[in-house]
Curated annotation (Swiss-Prot):
Name of the protein: Ribosomal RNA small subunit methyltransferase G
Any matching Pfam family: GidB
Database matches in HAMAP family: 16SrRNA_methyltr_G
Positions annotated to bind S-adenosyl-L-methionine: 70, 75, 120-121, 138
Locations listed in the record: Cytoplasm
InterPro entries per the UniProt record, alphabetical: rRNA_ssu_MeTfrase_G, SAM-dependent_MTases_sf
NCBIfam families: rsmG_gidB (TIGR00138)
Amino acid sequence: MTQPLDDAASAIFGPRLELAQCYADWLGTAGVERGLLGPREVDRLWERHVLNSAVIGELLDHGERVVDIGSGAGLPALPLAIARHDLQVVLLEPMLRRVEFLQEVVTDLGLAVEVVRGRAEERSVRERLGGSDAAVSRAVAALDKLAKWSMPLLKREGRMLAIKRGASSR
């Protein structure tokens, strides 16, 4: 990392920076090997993936329940869970190989994060995860489709936070 990235990472992750580094290591090795992240992304893991995901924590209140729709390799929710360990984070992912990767990472890092295999549009998922404070996602689908998936998972005042094309939108 460059000095500005070091400073940003320290500011965002504080005493949990080492956990964030371990997650970045997972992404750069097993994440690439298992096809969850392209090999060209390794050089920009921190700037484009880890930090870009963690900063949405500024939009969440203490202790909120957050569902990551289509977690994939754990972005944005794992950096968010590392930076904001007060949050109740649920990773929602339909693909078994990704779920297995996420469970391995969560266990290895000792994170209090729930991994659920399923799709947001499934009735059982809506019943289990409905009433959440926020739904987050990163490069999952068009916003209109994402809104259809997110709304049933949210409580009345809930928020959908989507990271699209390198920028965070609310």
